[in-house]
Amino acid sequence: MLTILQANPATRRRYLALRVALLVHIVLALSLVCLAQTEQTPASSKPADGKPLTSDERAELLKLIKSLQERVDKLEAAQATQAPTTQTPATSLAPQSETKYDPSTSDDPHVWMEPVVKEKPVSEAPAAASYGRYTPNLGYKLANTEYGDMSVSIYTYARYLNQLGLASNYTDSFGNVKSVQERQDFQLQKVQIKFLGWVLDPKLRYFLYTWTSNATQGQGAQVVVAGNVGYTFNSHLTLAAGITSLPGVRSTEGNFPFWLSVDSRHIADEFFRPSYTSGVWVKGNVTKRIRYQVMLGNNMSTLGVSASRLDNKFNTLSSALVWAPTGEYGQGFGDFDDHQTLTSRLGVHFTRSDENKESQPNSDNFENTQLRLSDGTVIFTPDLFAPGVTITDATYRMMDIDGGLKYRGLAIEGEYYWRWLNNFKFLTEPTQLQRQQVPQSLFDHGFQLQASAMIVPKTMQFYVGTSRINGQYGKPWDIRSGVNWFPWKNKVVRWNNEWLYLYKSPVGYSSVPFALGGKGSVFHSTLELAF
């Protein structure tokens, strides 16, 4: 009985109609019995009004009622067994869906931080196909409703690093001898947990993450909890705010982790590039083949820097304009996608920022960048150019041009950088003699060049690369060679082995395989998981 009462409205209406019909049937039966008894009474007998029924009459009525009750019980039992069957189609039907843009098919390098919105349910009714769906590098679908969706994605890698081939010390351009740490260790290097999706409207998207670098245990920015939120008005304009990388070079456009090496740049790219900061930005397509991104931020690197250490100028500006003549270039470096026709790209980047000594991060924090001379010395170092002279402020300007070609698993990609540092301010006003020892401006330029080939399509990739910095205080360079194995023929799991040779590296910290001032060979082997 409870099952029937809990059924849907249509079932309850059928049940009530059945009960009414049975009651009418009982009343008619009783009337027929009484009529039959009346007809059997002799004509000379007195009316039976007011007399109780005889024992035979009562027995006949009870027998009839019992028979009707048994029929009611059987009908109720049959109705109860049919109720779940009638409800099954209603619960098993998936909600209608509206096809949405799938960013995993885009050549936009920012798609790794965009949610997958393949289907938008019309109702909140459960749909098995909407939950647990997996999209490589964009994770598993946790929720999918008409009011929003959420996916979870994890990126991590374990690395063996051997720097024993490096010289134990180096001499900077000012004659100072400094030591080089020669590491050999194994680290679960980085763990990133990402939550991404949309809320209320598929155009309103969020990207939240926790990010840790275990090699920098104890550092101020060893663990980062960050993210951003944006609204896409159309294909030409997305407005967003939060923490992201300044798009000053190709590797900071948003294509991480789709690099040839695992989470490791060439030293020239590391030397010139900006880093992550808080701010606002716009991006979109100018045409189908030209896209742009412009960001206004706090400083060049916010990791490990509190708001109390920032200046109040809010004048860090970075931009990227990318042209793909064929309309599609693909994510990241190398031709894993095996383009069957020649595809190319050309990018132009520009960044400027007024930097202050207080707004600079600690030098060993991961993913940070600092203003350095080409020998690796931070320009805010006290007494750097002359005794008693300390630079506290400087203006950073950097222009970058990159280009690339891809064809049938082969790729060649290069980048050139120009950087200017000027508008120096000092802790104390230098004397005329001291000013003669301090350069009015600094100019450095350099390049990186990488070539790669898919030896076995979707499985084995070989690459080589080199970079060089032409600076006023040194001309460091590096070369590297490596191989990537993709055992499942996708970018979810990768085993990378790489050898590199450093010559007076001007950059380096515990999160990367190269060391500051390093000269010599380095080997590292890395197992990467990105789902």
Which residue stretches match the model-derived regions?
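Bacterial N-terminal signal peptides
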Residues: 19-31
